[in-house]
Each structure stands twice: as C-alpha cells, then as structure tokens.
A protein has these predicted regions:
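Short aromatic-rich membrane-water interface segments that cap or initiate transmembrane helices
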Residues: 16, 84-100, 161-162
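Juxtamembrane interface elements at the cytosolic ends of transmembrane helices
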Residues: 30-43, 69-81, 100-122
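Flexible, glycine/proline-enriched loop segments at strand-loop-helix junctions
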Residues: 47, 53-56, 86-91, 102
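Inter-helical loop and helix-membrane interface segments of multi-pass membrane transporters/permeases
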Residues: 7-14, 73-91
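Alpha-helical transmembrane segments of multi-pass integral membrane proteins
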Residues: 56-71, 94-110, 131-145
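Early transmembrane hairpin module of multi-pass membrane proteins
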Residues: 2-8, 88-92, 101-102, 112, ...
Length: 166
C-alpha cells in the first residue's frame, strides 16, 4: 500500500510487469499457510501429503520472489509511463537463475536456523547441508555478480567507472 500511495506510476508499471510471478508467489504462500493449518488436523496417513504441500508452497513462493527480483534487474520496458512488455517478459534465463539462487539462500538460512535449534543427528545433517549450501550460494552470487554487468552496459558503467570505483 505504501508503494501505491507514494509512487503510483512505479506501482502500476511494476505490478503490470510482474502480475504472473507475483500471483504464483501468492498462491505458494497461500498453499504454505493452508498446509500448515491442515497438517495438524490431518490423520497420520495424510500428514506427509501436507508436509509436501508446505514444502512445495514454500519453494514456489521463494522461487517466484527470486524470479521477480531477476526480472526487475533485467529491466522493465516502459513507454509513455506504461508497461510496454508482454505477459512473459519476466521469464528469462537470468530471472530463473536468480530464483534458483534465492532458493539456495533460503535453504541455507533454514539449515543454519536448525543448527541453532536442534541437536543430535538432525544437527549433524544440517551442518553438512549448510556447508554444501554455502558453496552453492557462493557460486550463485559469483555468477550473478558477473552476469549482471556483462548483460547490462549501464550497470557495468556504474560499477566500473570513476568516481564510482574506489
């Protein structure tokens, strides 16, 4: 609501560009919430299904949040103050890669939280997972940090010209 009140033009352009990934992110969040509620009311036989629904909803929300970020970094075509792109302009290799990178980020965050809160076998499993995910995340950060200025001359210019450097 704050974005709409402060910057209505930016709000309309951004929302128009990312309707589909934002709606899919919302569906993931809804699925996650419903799964969380129904898991505790389900029979033992059905709990595994609700666990999978929770995982799927969480992964979808995270992935489409990353896809939206990647699409935003790629840029939004605007003409005369209106969104000038198509319904799937947000869907490209960079945005999908960014979505996967955010999945790795949140997985690392979750595994480190479990390291703090658990002990025993789960703690050991999460330590191993966190080490692996840290390396995966570093690869995503490195790739995105290289990809961004190589794909966008304007960003490369801001990053690598004087007085911005140093």
């Amino acid at each position: 609501a704050g974005l709409l009140a402060a910057f209505p033009l930016a709000y309309s352009v951004i929302l128009s560009a990312f309707y589909l990934p934002l709606i899919l992110m919302l569906i993931g969040l809804i699925f996650r919430g419903v799964a969380f509620e129904f898991r505790f009311k389900a029979s033992d036989r059905r709990r595994g299904s609700w666990d999978l629904a929770f995982i799927g909803g969480s992964a979808a929300a995270t992935f489409f949040q990353g896809v939206t970020l990647g699409g935003f970094i790629e840029g939004i075509p605007v003409r005369d103050g209106r969104y000038a792109g198509g319904a799937f302009d947000w869907l490209n290799a960079f945005s999908v890669f960014t979505g996967c990178g955010l999945l790795a980020t949140y997985a690392l965050l979750g595994s480190t939280w479990l390291i703090m809160k658990t002990e025993g076998l789960l703690l050991l499993r999460m330590r191993l997972m966190a080490r692996t995910l840290a390396w995966v995340l570093l690869m995503f950060i490195g790739a995105i940090s290289l990809w961004t200025p190589l794909a966008h001359e304007r960003i490369a210019e801001r990053w690598f010209t004087w007085p911005n450097m140093g």
